[in-house]
């Protein structure tokens, strides 16, 4: 049994070698010749999986180690009788922590408290729900917009997008990309929406590039609209609008979900799905894969305020480390993918062990996802 895996999927060689012969290949572009005798293909979001790639090939199963699936033609796979699995929620924690890192940086730079801001969350799936929970743990007001969930009658106080635009100081997008249909998200943030944002608002896109109309956004910024922008995703990736990058406050190369934990979850989820597909079901404990953290233990005295939270968050991950490299190489062919391929190891907040002498600080840090314990001062 021959299994092709994206060369940038961590732990893929070790895990899938338990099931068959593993060949690691680049994800963009996939070497088509390798597909001629392969039984399974494991990809990431950079690989377009469709009829033109797989027609006439012996592939029986496709796995994507990503939460999003808009790069996969699921309807064609089903029609062709090819098994499929994604990894929903695998990188949700990472994306939430990316958003926090960005917001805390902007709050420090511009001198505002997040408690004084209302956050509008567009898309309340694995990422949006976790983001809502962490923001509300901090006492920050959130507004939710998710028409598909609202129409299904899912639990939640869902509002219209217009209401979020009117009332939110921060608008952050966490939707799939739907190019048509009743829940179309292509250019959901169009010129009209962008121009309608509150003065001084913050716009964040960490889902799919085309959810925000990049051309319209650049037009508004060029005209001097008072708006802070965080973009991790771009229309036309791996190409991007260099002029837009110059205008945004934070720009990164589609790495919001790139924690070691998130990548490992993605790989293990598709591994487990494929092992079940072939009748040799196996399960993997995530902590058996992850290396020891680089941190020892941190001692925190007193309550948790915003400056202290910012220091803890940025100790684990400061978004500026990914903004600067992109600006240096933007516009150079191949460099966007190279930044992603050679991405520095990044951990999640759970990797930081915090000893608190304040019980409320320890409790709050645990709610936020840190590994915190309370030890009263002696």
UniProtKB/Swiss-Prot annotation:
Pathway it belongs to? Cofactor biosynthesis; pyridoxine 5'-phosphate biosynthesis; pyridoxine 5'-phosphate from D-erythrose 4-phosphate: step 2/5
Residues reported to bind NAD(+): 146, 175, 232, 257
The subcellular location is: Cytoplasm
E.C. number(s) listed in UniProt: 1.1.1.290
- Using the UniProt record, name the top-level EC class of this enzyme in a single word: oxidoreductase
Q: Quaternary state and partners of this protein?
A: Homodimer.
Question: What name has this protein been given in UniProt?
Answer: Erythronate-4-phosphate dehydrogenase
Which organism's genome codes for this protein? Escherichia coli O127:H6 (strain E2348/69 / EPEC)
